[in-house]
């Protein structure tokens, strides 16, 4: 079947459509007429004038709708207001302002995080072997705890001079360095000498020999 048959059936089913176009705008032609006629009516300047006039008449009444916005047309069809189409944009803009670099709340949160990191670094425990030993490091007076002093005094009571192996053992036990143990024993020996007033030549030579032996070990 030809396409013209379906077109005629459609227009006969909806008779109201025939009143839109002027009579004679679409002359009835068969499918053979379209194939045999190279110049079809309606595409030229002369025969197509009624069709163009009918089209202008069709859209002339819709000029009032042309000035309306698309949102207004769809809102009127569905019973909504034009402002309802922009309702979904408000939460997005609020969320966008929350992640903006200039947001004061975000800046305050970043400052608090930085302060907490600095506080955590300041509370970080530093052991003696973690301290820097460069030439520019300012040395301070070493303080010993009561437990460390008690253990060192006990060791000094039994032996005033320590071997290197014994210094390593005491340093690991008391969480000190070998240098700290060595300095403490040197100061303790000087204090012991002042208390006992041992200024004899024999005793001084013996202490010097023992000190040299300690350095070699």
Swiss-Prot record:
UniProt-listed GO biological process terms:
anterior/posterior pattern specification; embryonic skeletal system morphogenesis; myeloid cell differentiation; positive regulation of branching involved in ureteric bud morphogenesis
Q: Which GO CC annotations does the UniProt entry carry?
A: cytosol; nuclear body
DNA-binding feature ranges: 137-196
Q: Which ranges belong to the motif Antp-type hexapeptide?
A: 126-131
Q: What Pfam families is this protein classified in? A: Homeodomain (PF00046)
Q: Which UniProt keywords apply?
A: Developmental protein, DNA-binding, Homeobox, Nucleus, Transcription, Transcription regulation
Its main subcellular localisation, reduced to a broad class, is: nucleus
Could you give a GO molecular-function term held by this entry?
A: RNA polymerase II cis-regulatory region sequence-specific DNA binding
Tell me which SMART domains the record gives. Answer: HOX (SM00389)
Tell me which domain of life the UniProt entry assigns to the organism this sequence originates from. Eukaryota
Recorded hits in InterPro entries, A to Z, give:
Antp_homeobox (IPR050296), HD (IPR001356), HD_metazoa (IPR020479), Homeobox_antennapedia (IPR017995), Homeobox_Antennapedia_CS (IPR001827), Homeobox_CS (IPR017970), Homeodomain-like_sf (IPR009057)
Which region ranges are annotated with the description Disordered?
192-217
Family to which this protein belongs: Belongs to the Antp homeobox family.
Outline the subunit composition: Forms a DNA-binding heterodimer with transcription factor PBX1.
Q: What does this protein do?
A: Sequence-specific transcription factor which is part of a developmental regulatory system that provides cells with specific positional identities on the anterior-posterior axis.
Name it.
Homeobox protein Hox-B7
Look up and give the organism this protein is from: Mus musculus
């Amino acid at each position: 079947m030809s396409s013209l048959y379906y077109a005629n059936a459609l227009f006969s089913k909806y008779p109201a459509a025939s009143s839109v176009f002027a009579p004679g705008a679409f002359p009835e032609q068969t499918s053979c007429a379209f194939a045999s006629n190279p110049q079809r009516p309606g595409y030229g300047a002369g025969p197509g004038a009624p069709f163009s006039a009918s089209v202008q008449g069709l859209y002339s009444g819709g000029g009032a709708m042309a000035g309306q916005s698309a949102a207004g047309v769809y809102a009127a069809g569905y019973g909504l207001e034009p402002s309802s189409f922009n309702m979904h944009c408000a939460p997005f803009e609020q969320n966008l302002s929350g992640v903006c670099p200039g947001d004061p709340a975000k800046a305050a949160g970043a400052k608090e995080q930085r302060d907490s990191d600095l506080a955590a670094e300041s509370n970080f425990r530093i052991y003696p072997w973690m301290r820097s030993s460069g030439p520019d490091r300012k040395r301070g007076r070493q303080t010993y705890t009561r437990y460390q002093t008690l253990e060192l005094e006990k060791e000094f009571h039994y032996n005033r001079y320590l071997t290197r192996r014994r210094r390593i053992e005491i340093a690991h036990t008391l969480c000190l360095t070998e240098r700290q143990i060595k300095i403490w024993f040197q100061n303790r020996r000087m204090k012991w000498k002042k208390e006992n007033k041992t200024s004899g030549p024999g005793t001084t030579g013996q202490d010097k020999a023992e000190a040299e032996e300690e350095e070699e070990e």
